[in-house]
């Protein structure tokens, strides 16, 4: 995945943007950890995850109403999301970053099979450009 990204045509196309991404990656770190925010609004429990990496030593909130998940950056996304669902047990998942949001280090992710991977009792919300999501 890393080699494919480094040698993709997007590296040339977005080389100026890549410099900014690399600089901000080092500048905007939060203790060199993956960030996961948990909040509650009017009894609606929400997790905002900046990554699909979960630490086995951490106890995460469970049975949340919404998991906002960055779905990007791995070659085993389907396998990884199944593990996240087992750990967090969300009622609904809102995908982010499944599009080419940070070229050249991101790419468009094929999400067409995702509904087959996620249990049917879990809502899957795929945001659309300029369309409001009502929770």
Sequence positions of predicted segments:
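Alpha-helical scaffolding within the catalytic cores
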Residues: 54, 77-83
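Loop/helix-junction capping segments adjacent to catalytic residues or to phosphate/diphosphate-binding pockets
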Residues: 75-78, 104
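Conserved phosphate-coordination/catalytic loops
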Residues: 27-30, 75, 108
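Active-site beta-loop-alpha substructure in enzyme catalytic cores
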Residues: 63-70
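Active-site metal-binding loops of divalent metal-dependent hydrolases
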Residues: 50-52, 71-73, 98-99
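Structural motif
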Residues: 44-46, 66, 92
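Core dinuclear metal-dependent hydrolase active-site scaffold
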Residues: 1-62, 131-135
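Binuclear metal-ion centers of metallo-dependent hydrolases, dominated by the metallo-beta-lactamase
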Residues: 60-61, 82, 88-135
């Amino acid at each position: 995945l890393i080699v494919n990204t480094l040698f993709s045509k997007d590296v040339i196309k977005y080389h100026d943007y890549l410099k900014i991404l690399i600089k901000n990656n080092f500048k905007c770190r939060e203790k060199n950890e993956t960030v996961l925010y948990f909040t509650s609004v009017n009894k609606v429990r929400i997790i905002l995850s900046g990554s699909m990496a979960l630490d086995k030593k951490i106890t995460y909130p469970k049975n949340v109403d919404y998991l906002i998940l960055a779905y990007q950056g791995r070659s085993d996304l389907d396998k990884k999301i199944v593990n996240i669902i087992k750990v967090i047990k969300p009622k609904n998942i809102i995908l982010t970053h499944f599009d080419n949001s940070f070229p050249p280090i991101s790419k468009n992710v094929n999400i067409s099979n995702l509904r087959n991977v996620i249990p049917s009792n879990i809502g899957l919300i795929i945001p659309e450009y300029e369309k409001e999501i009502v929770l």
